[in-house]
Amino acid sequence: MVYTILGEEIFKRGIDKYFELFDGQAVTCEDFIYAMECVSARDFSLFKNWYKTNGTPTVKCEVSNYNEDDGDFVKIKISQFNAKNSNILMIPLKIAIFDANGNPIQMENNQNEKIILLDEKEKEFIFEKKDNKLLAIIDNAVINEVNKNKFISKENMIFSVNRGFSAPVNLDYGLSFESKKILAKKDSDFYNKYNYFKEIILENMLQDVLEDKIDNSLNMAKFIEEVILNYSVDDLSLVYFLRLPTFDDLSEKFIENLPVKRIFEVIKKYETKIAVVLKNKLIELYSYHIDNPDVFSPVNMQKRTLRTKIIYYLAKLENEKNIIEKHYFDTSNITNKIAVLNAIRDIMDVDFYKYFMDDFYNNYRDYHLLIDKWMALNSTTTRDEQSALINVKMIMETSYFNIKNPNNVRALIGGFANNNFCIHGESFEGYSFLFDMIEKLDKINSSVASGIVKTFAKFKTLKKDNKAYIKNHLEKLLENKNLSLAVFEITDKILNN
């Protein structure tokens, strides 16, 4: 934030001053700020409040516009609030402004971005617009001449606020759905672009979860396609726009009656729709970004990440099995092979899935870390409610699983414990199995056992019957007089939280 407030040149001078004054000494954050004050002649008293403020402040933005014969004006009112502390903070906010079509509106000196400083509880910034450009922020004398009562809320200008995460704050900015879409497509700042993209997808998926008759998956797949088409084919950052909200992202929105099965249905529906709508684009990207498995470099890592995500989507399509097979067998890179196993673990063609899983096991059964990954893949399938538990019980009977080996347990039983689709199934068999394992493991390794207990940390958000079953078994755990302290403390905390 200090860099953002001062700019590169003054900040570098501040760093030089800092070493001049304090090199070789035991220093504090305040000493660092003092060096910056020396070279900038700026008072950082309010900035120091960051070092003694708990919680994350919320910055609220309200935008309004009005027109007069002598000019157009746009006002943004920004206020700060922190429920845990009343300290006023110095908050630098990078902003840019776009019109209703997503075109950037230039400000003074032909810049597309400006830094405004919120150093009061509430502050207003008024811009004057001429010739489709926003001039400098009007000074206080002119503001007094502006009739503030004429400002009305309109969205012919869209503010992109806190660009580049210029300040660690929560932003309360009531943008409309359409304005968010414009920023997700056209904003040149990756941080805000991706954040609004995530918000849009999450809002639509959540709507689908809550309303069985609503299906936004096709519209969202087309929206993702529009966002991706704005990227050049060689821009590897577009992989972020192929990532959907996870079960954890969606479940956080519920405080009770968590619809586990419905959430997974919606996720799978969106994944399939994206694969269908973006099929040609995905294949184009996959063919373009060939990674070199023998060269370790950031670029090759990014390419593998992108191709891994593409393989995951293509596995949803029945007629793209050749690409999946080629991706697996034409590489010696384990990351690529595991990407295929991860992509196909939930498909309904069990024979196709088993073909690759058997091949991986037969080739790498002497490599314990790889077999741990293989176990985890078996225990995390969400093909149906029973498959994962059947896999786990079967593997536990084999010679390559050792319940006294923590890595084996974390991979197989820990993997199943994180398989929300299966453990929260209607039969409650997953719960029963895990509670049996907790008691058994507690006698062998209480640390591992307590980790599995944490699976039930949010059980109070589940539906009534699920909650009752889990609560009953957690209470039974506490009645066990031989229970380890580690498991007892975690269990007691979960029950009484």
Predicted regions and their residues:
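Non-catalytic accessory/interaction domains
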Residues: E8-K12, D16-Y355, H368-K373, Q386-A388, ...
